Structures are given as C-alpha cells and as structure tokens.
C-alpha cells in the first residue's frame, strides 16, 4: 500500500477577486472546474493569474470565464501561441447551469469570479451570483468594517 503524500505548506489559493465582494452582494456561490491548456496550468502553479476584471457569461448552454488574465511563463510556452486573456470554459453540471440561467434572467443579477484555487490536483474557480451595490451600500459596509475594528481595539485595551 502506498503512503499518502504529505501536504505541501502554503495556501491553495491562486488569486482572489476582492473587488467583487466590494462592488456586489454575493447571493449564491458555486464551484466550477476550468478547461485549461498546459501552459496555463504551469502559469497557475507559479501563481501568475489575475481575476480582478473577470466575469462569467452564459452562452449556448455553457458557462465561460471572460476577462481572466493568466500570464504565460517564458520557458513553458515557447512552442505554442499563448493568449493570456482567452475565454475559458467553466465545467459545471447541468443542474448548476440551469440554476445560473434562472438567476441571471432576473433583473440586475450577474455572475462574477470570486477566487481561483487548487483542490487536490485540479484548478477550481469559485463563482458567485451577485447583485450590484449602490454607493450608499458600499459606505455602510465600510462603516461596519471600521466599527468591527474599533470594537476589537476597545476589547483589547479593556483587558489591560
């Protein structure tokens, strides 16, 4: 019987989309696989990915990740033409796709990429069904975050 491999230290997260949580209310999250080329996997292993401007489009019964940027490595991609911003297919089952279509057809909803991470040896993307925030919503979130920090600071000094 073979031994299990020891877990490598470090985070499995490749990239986060912090702006999505700031600009949208995330109502539901899904985990999707990505159809990648070989050079893209090597770039992800090196951590060269940016999903800050990415979103998901639903077309012809399939979901596509649009706007994600995977910077090609110079040594890994000498024999192929690399398009860092190509549209990548998301791997979801039919039930999840139907749920996404149903949510998108409602007014004001969109699907955004939230994070890119490794799950075992597979690259996964967490996508979220989101509704845009207004400016006053962003301000109230900022006030709430500052209040949480102030509470923590007060509790820390109260124990002294």
UniProtKB/Swiss-Prot annotation:
GO terms for cellular component: cytosol. It is found in: Cytoplasm. GO terms for molecular function: RNA binding. It holds the Pfam family SmpB. One of its GO terms (biological process) is trans-translation. Keywords: Cytoplasm, RNA-binding. InterPro entries: SmpB, SsrA-bd_prot, SsrA-bd_prot_CS. Gene3D superfamilies: 2.40.280.10. Belongs to the SmpB family. Required for rescue of stalled ribosomes mediated by trans-translation. Binds to transfer-messenger RNA (tmRNA), required for stable association of tmRNA with ribosomes. tmRNA and SmpB together mimic tRNA shape, replacing the anticodon stem-loop with SmpB. tmRNA is encoded by the ssrA gene; the 2 termini fold to resemble tRNA(Ala) and it encodes a 'tag peptide', a short internal open reading frame. During trans-translation Ala-aminoacylated tmRNA acts like a tRNA, entering the A-site of stalled ribosomes, displacing the stalled mRNA. This is SsrA-binding protein. It comes from Salmonella arizonae (strain ATCC BAA-731 / CDC346-86 / RSK2980). The gene is smpB.
């Amino acid at each position: 019987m073979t031994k299990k491999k020891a877990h490598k230290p470090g985070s499995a997260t490749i990239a986060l989309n912090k702006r999505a949580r700031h600009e949208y209310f995330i109502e539901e999250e899904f985990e999707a696989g990505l159809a990648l080329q070989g050079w893209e996997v090597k770039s992800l292993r090196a951590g060269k990915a940016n999903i800050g401007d990415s979103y998901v489009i639903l077309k012809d019964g399939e979901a596509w990740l649009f706007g994600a940027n995977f910077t090609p490595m110079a040594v890994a991609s000498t024999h192929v033409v690399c398009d860092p911003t190509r549209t990548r297919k998301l791997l979801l089952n039919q039930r999840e796709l139907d749920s996404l279509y149903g949510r998108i057809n409602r007014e004001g909803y969109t699907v955004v990429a939230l994070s890119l991470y490794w799950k075992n040896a597979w690259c996964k993307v967490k996508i979220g069904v989101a509704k845009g925030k207004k400016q006053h919503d962003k301000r109230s979130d900022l006030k709430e975050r500052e209040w949480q920090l102030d509470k923590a600071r007060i509790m820390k000094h109260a124990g002294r």
